[in-house]
Amino acid sequence: MVAGEVPESTQCPSLTSLNTKDVVRRRHKRRSRQHQRFMARKALLQEQELLSTAPGPGLCLLPSPSQMPAVTEASDSRRQRPKARSGSNGLCSKKSVPREAPRPGPIKCVAIDCEMVGTGPQGRVSELARCSVVSYSGDVLYDKYIRPEMPIVDYRTRWSGITRQHMHKAIPFQVAQKEILKLLKGKVVVGHALHNDFQALKYVHPRSQTRDTTYVPNLLSQPSSLIRTRVSLKDLALNLLHKKIQVGHQGHSSVEDAMTAMELYQLVEVQWEQQVASSAQAPAEDRGPDSSTDVEQYMDDQYWPEDLTQSTGAETNGGPDRQEGEEGQGARSAPP
């Protein structure tokens, strides 16, 4: 080794350490500048309300300066979009949309028919002896014989189908009334000449929830009005449903009559409910008569066999004498 020459092993470590320090210093400066730019960009975005509190620097992706205007425009449109949607979207808008009239539906709709017998002087007072209630689909919900409060004078078997034997298993009127009203309350009640059934039940059903099938012919011919037509359930069933009811000599079946009334209602259900919805807004004086108070139609000759009406004579003179015949059969005279 030449004198004065520095050993190679001692010279290299010092150069290496210097280079390492420079590299670390330069990296630190580079990181500091990046951090400063990061913090400046973050502060700018927060000032423009484009950046909320982030979970951490590592999870926050910031746009480059060239992308910032586009982000700002997108954010502005994003903030304005809910306002436009709240005013125009159908789900949030309060503007009324034309809809069909609400329909009662199967659960809220029942049909009823009652059969009456004669009590009081000459059997001229009608009292409930059988009641049947069917559902919208025609299922029998109630069908029981009922013992009148007064002694029966005329069973009216030819039309009511009630005989003395039926009264052996009949239930008291008060019991039947409670059971039936539980089925009717809160529901749309369908029936033919319903004022007679409600009168026998000693009950007044809300007019808005009453569908009397005596209106059906008028709905089919003039959907814009509701005027009761004096036509029998038997004729309506034959002409509109093409079915025969109330045939034979065993009297009417309240179950059959209730089912027929429901079928007639379903025939014009849509038009009827639309008419009811529109008439609800009309003044009270423009509405038709209430089916719960009209008693004249009950004794109209179209509701009873011709031989009965012919034998009654002049109804306005106090009514006819009771027909002779089998026990339990007789004619019902008109009210004085």
Swiss-Prot record:
Domain Exonuclease as annotated: residue spans: 109-265
Feature: compositional bias, Basic residues: 24-37
UniProt-listed InterPro entries: Exonuclease_RNaseT/DNA_pol3 (IPR013520), REXO1/3/4-like (IPR047021), RNaseH-like_sf (IPR012337), RNaseH_sf (IPR036397)
Motif position, Nucleolar localization signal: 25-33
SUPFAM superfamilies from the UniProt entry: Ribonuclease H-like
A single MF term (Gene Ontology): nucleic acid binding
Any Gene Ontology biological process: intrinsic apoptotic signaling pathway in response to DNA damage by p53 class mediator
Polar residues: bias regions: 8-20
GO CC terms: nuclear membrane; nucleolus; nucleoplasm
Positions occupied by motif Nuclear localization signal: 164-187
Subcellular location: Nucleus; Nucleus, Nucleolus
UniProt key word DNA damage: yes
Pfam families per record: RNase_T
Source species, domain of life: Eukaryota
Function of the protein: Exonuclease with activity against single- and double-stranded DNA and RNA. Mediates p53-induced apoptosis. When induced by p53 following DNA damage, digests double-stranded DNA to form single-stranded DNA and amplifies DNA damage signals, leading to enhancement of apoptosis.
Protein's recorded name: Apoptosis-enhancing nuclease
Gene: Aen
